[in-house]
């Protein structure tokens, strides 16, 4: 009896103790796709109570999540995932139990999911002396990026006016931006849409969990097997703007019971397009990944991928050429050979990427990972090269009517007969070979050029300019949640890059050999054979220049060495609805050039440090006019080293769990890139004078709403970029020589607003959506210019101010357009006209309707673009270009020479239609059809550049004239149709 009483009292006391404690429970569940009930991995889930954010987590590979240790009460769950519409769920925790939500389904967001992301890769080409990349990746979880990232890319829109180099792009945590140029290399995985579909993106100056980033966002593509959508997927795509056919097949096992995951993908892109002759694709892609999860703590992943292939390039031309042929899509790079199109400029690439990643997760509060990545292979593009022969380009300025006759008599071009004759040849189409590359003529010239030994010495050849990288990277990151309020994140990046830059002889075009000598040097130094040599060591060993065969290296050959390392860390503080972050980074960058051949023009010193002489006694060693040191093309250049650093801060306040206000601020420095640090890396080791790090300041403030079907974001941003450098090489008509030009101290300011929204209308399943980007991106300094002659390093100008780069004066005119002058006869100043960062619309807007019902989607979007400007060259903004031969600057000369061309506004109409069907919840078949530029606008300039040449043989000898600018135009109406099948 006593024993029973004791047990009863003990049980009662235990129960009272339990009742006295605060009951704690939790929430668990599984996130699945509403379409096929498959698990949604890496979904982001935010738990809030009122205006306070309690916790955040992500789903595992099976779609599961858990929020433990929650006090009783009502909570909101916001679930977000790539390619799905965000959703909000209310949940109540009571009696200390863990509430199981079981399956929480997300509706697929299909509007953009099936479109071909390889559009981005097509901007990654410098084949025309013009380079451009988009700087917005698709961002389904941000309404502005989701709309602008697709709709604005048509006109080569740059996010906030920033260059593509400013965007931090990573694979499995490794920064992939090119070591030499900083460019985002989208082409390395173009065609692998399924394998690279999952992305984590952070905007502006925000610091990510996987990298510090810059001022233009950071994106990570996990790329390993467990991130590829489970199952089989095949698709067939055709489009009229890029290539005729794309075939793609992908398989992913998903996580298996034994901890392994596998994924494979392959694709082919083939054919030409409806608009630009000579542009074609013959590209393939492959991907394989395996992953082993040993337990909840250790995971090892490996991946291997590449996109081998080739594509024909487009070239820009002047408006005169486009008007002569009556087609703004004219491409001067191709011609007929034996009845078939042949493009002279073809990009050929095969750059495999191999990576190995280890993830370490000892607890829910700590995780870390490290990735080793190696990029290698070849990257080249072909071009025509010639010696002692006429320029083979069909749109060369001497082939055009304007070369013979101009209405302005001061041009000294007054031969109307020859102009009419040239125009007749272009417009009547008597001989198509005259307006395209005349391959037959090139072969005939070579096959009729016998040397004394009866061999055919080619005057025309096709070269391939190679940039072959060996790029090793090691990156790591960690995240530690110290308690409910503090989280510490950090990591490191290290890179060792060695890139070989050289040319090979791709095609002798019917000849037997081509001589490895410097064509420009032959014009000045023909009497000294050693001066002409591209490879003095070969000449010394053999007594003559090398007779080149197909596949031989020639011209130039050097290594670009780049080393970099950095550390970064971020501390996050969260309390209720308030969060704050502070982050910092420090790093070091070093680079140098290693010449692999000794060039006759810049022989340097011999192994004993002595001067080198030619056999006729001519001194081959030359000296830098600034440093007094011997200029060498062979061996190592000076090693340049830079210390970089940065700091960022962020504040965020959530209002009711559906709305947030946040801001970012950052200051960071960047080392100048290798490609913008050497005056002429093809020929010598000379560096740009006074290289300093680029200094960036950025700030933004944002308001965002995500509530049910209502999505909106408004942002304002301000960024300054200071102390940039740039280099170029061009033919200087005034010096009658090929020259090198370096600019330093280029400053920019970018400021503006962004708006994105998608809101429901009174009509069921119909949404109003739109995006707006309005900014002012201007130059804020007049840089300094140094110019040297390429063949001799002779100094033409040293650190001279380019006075009309930032702006130019505009003078007052009367109603008749005549200049108003003061009492002394001088034109009266009116205002300064700003000069703008080029090649992107500074006003871009989109408004449209989106309808979604029963797995149908239909979108109509109208876009408007304005305030886009032509890329400027510094020569036209100098005093001597504006002054002319008489060295007198008139108001008319300044305004003519220094002004920047503004493109006309443009508008577009785009339509997207798609439908998918699910069969037995196991299979999915669907299609998406996209029509762009439905109104068939063919006069929209998307970019271009000013030529760097001057008309100097004028009648008056008082002024210079510009050469015509060159442009790219938007394709007319085009479509894309994709049919896919999943199981």
Spell out what each predicted region is:
Residues 721-723, 866-889, 915-983:
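C-terminal beta-signal and adjacent terminal beta-strands/loops
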Residues 316-321, 536-547, 590, 601-629, ...:
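Surface-exposed extracellular loop regions of Gram-negative outer-membrane beta-barrel proteins
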Residues 291, 299-357, 380-463, 527-552, ...:
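Acidic/polar loop-and-plug regions of large Gram-negative outer-membrane beta-barrel proteins
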Residues 329-353, 357, 627-642, 646, ...:
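Outer-membrane beta-barrel signature, preferentially recognizing the C-terminal barrel domain
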